[in-house]
Design a protein with these regions (language model features):
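FAD-binding core/adjacent interface of flavoenzyme oxidoreductases
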Residues: 1-8, 23-24, 29, 61, ...
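Beta1-alpha1 glycine-rich phosphate/pyrophosphate-binding loop at the start
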Residues: 3-71
Length: 121
């Protein structure tokens, strides 16, 4: 299958992009290497999320994933190891050996915290 769009990164930006891509009637695959929801899932209490007085980051991550999937977005828990553009398509290769092809690619890999290597960090 050739997807209209592949989104690399399943955090808030990637999942929101996938939701809007599906609402536009395009096929989309979201590839995330660790956990869907991104860094927000590390927050135990979020008090500035519209519509909620208080909600956990994990709940926000779950809601974003559920909404994207409800719209028809496909999701894969894979690590992307390479991307190549040949001709009109782009090929995304994962560590498992799986290959996916798309017409457009969004890279929404977010960030990760730096660690000091301390015990119990």
């Amino acid at each position: 299958m050739i997807y209209d769009v592949i989104v690399i990164g399943g955090g808030p930006a990637g999942l929101t992009a996938a939701t809007y891509i599906r609402r536009a009637g395009k096929s989309v695959l979201v590839i995330e290497k660790a956990a869907f929801g991104g860094q927000i899932t590390r927050s135990s209490n979020v008090e500035n999320f519209p519509g909620y007085i208080s909600v956990s980051g994990a709940q926000i991550g779950d809601m974003l994933l559920e909404q994207a999937m409800n719209q028809g977005a496909e999701v894969e828990l894979e690590e992307v190891v390479s991307v190549s553009a040949a001709g009109e398509g782009k090929t995304v290769v994962c560590a498992s050996g799986a290959e996916y092809t798309c017409r457009a690619l969004i890279i929404a890999t977010g960030a990760k915290p730096r660690t000091l290597g301390l015990e119990n960090e």
